[in-house]
Each structure stands twice: as structure tokens, then as C-alpha cells.
């Protein structure tokens, strides 16, 4: 899964990790924002790494949590979705706007390649082929609300991504980029 190879999303270990993440996310969401120590403890247990002074506004959603790494002084706004079937690495001082989606998993484009014939499935096997590629976000990045970042994308340092963008390719450092698809508009 973490190497970009096809994986079974119904694997017993993955399901156990996903159920654990959902339980921690429910507790995180129910914890008052005034109890920052408890919220931080939950994030430290949930995520692969959480830097100092990281703030995540609930609701927040992730698949497993253990593949998410967030650098110091980063802020994740309301309603963000991090599908972390591969690593999601966010640098320091990042601002992630509301309803941003960081999506590492994908599926083959052709239905014949994507769908597994039911007769050949084992008991705990997914009927869909899935693979994942990592997402990397540099330091000092601002991703505007409603942006979708697709599998395998790297966003460099000091980048601003405009709201509502669909980022399907790498964005170099020191850039302003936006659009559907997201394209560099100018250097910063």
C-alpha cells in the first residue's frame, strides 16, 4: 500500500487500524476546543507525527491516521479529509483551508482493471483494485478552502494554492497556483 502497489482495503490489519482511527476521531470531535491538552494527546495517538502548536479543527477525517505527518505551527481548518493510504507529509507553518481533501488512493481507470470478479474474491477481499501514492506539502504553504490534492502530488515550499483548485501535478516552490486543473500563475 505505502509503496504504490495495489492493496486490499479490506485487509484485517487495515480494517483494525481504520476502526481505531474512527474511534479516536470521534473522541477528538467530542473533545471541547478549550481542552487543547486532551485534543493534542488524541492527535499524537492518531497521527504518525504531529509537530508543536499544530491545530486541527473538527470535524476532521482520515482513513488510518498513522500515515499523516504534520509539521510545527500548522493549521488544518474544519471538514478536511485526509485519505492516508500512503503517506501525507505536511511541512511547518502550513495553512490548510476548510474542506480541503488530500487523497492518496486511486483506482485503475478502466472498469475491467478496477473491478475484481466476485467468484475470485476471498472472504475479506475488496472487489475493487486500489493503489496509493504519497502527497507531500512543503513548509509555509497555504492551501485555500475546497481544494482537492490528488495522489502522488508534491507541493513545494512557500506556495499558495487558490481556493477550489484541483491539484493533479507537482507545484514548484515559491509559486501562486490555482485552477481546475491547478496551474502555476506566477512566482512569489
Stretches found by the model and what they are:
Residues 148-182:
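C-terminal/domain-terminus segments
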Residues 1-53, 109-112, 120, 182-188:
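Terminal amphipathic alpha-helical/low-complexity segments used for targeting or macromolecular assembly
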Residues 60-70, 75-153, 180-181, 187-188:
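Flexible, glycine/small-residue-enriched loop-and-beta-strand segment within the central core
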Residues 1, 138, 156:
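Short, acidic, Ser/Thr-enriched surface-loop or helix-capping motifs
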Residues 32-33, 64, 84, 171:
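Residues at alpha-helix boundaries and short interhelical turns
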Amino acid at each position: 500500500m505505502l509503496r504504490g502497489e495495489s492493496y486490499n482495503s479490506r485487509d484485517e490489519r487495515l480494517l483494525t487500524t481504520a476502526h481505531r482511527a474512527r474511534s479516536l476521531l470521534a473522541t477528538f470531535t467530542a473533545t471541547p476546543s478549550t481542552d487543547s491538552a486532551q485534543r493534542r494527546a488524541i492527535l499524537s495517538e492518531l497521527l504518525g507525527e504531529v509537530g508543536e502548536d499544530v491545530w486541527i479543527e473538527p470535524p476532521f477525517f482520515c482513513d488510518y491516521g498513522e500515515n499523516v505527518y504534520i509539521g510545527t505551527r500548522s493549521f488544518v481548518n474544519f471538514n478536511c479529509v485526509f485519505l492516508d493510504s500512503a503517506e501525507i507529509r505536511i511541512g511547518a507553518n502550513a495553512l490548510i483551508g476548510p474542506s480541503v481533501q488530500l487523497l492518496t488512493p486511486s483506482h485503475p481507470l478502466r472498469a475491467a482493471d478496477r473491478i475484481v470478479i466476485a467468484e475470485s474474491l476471498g472472504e475479506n477481499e475488496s472487489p475493487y483494485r486500489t493503489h496509493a501514492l504519497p502527497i507531500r506539502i512543503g513548509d509555509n504553504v497555504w492551501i485555500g478552502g475546497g481544494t482537492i490534492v490528488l495522489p502522488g502530488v508534491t507541493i513545494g515550499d512557500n506556495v499558495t494554492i487558490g481556493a477550489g483548485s484541483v491539484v493533479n501535478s507537482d507545484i514548484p516552490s515559491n509559486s501562486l497556483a490555482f485552477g481546475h486543473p491547478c496551474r502555476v500563475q506566477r512566482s512569489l
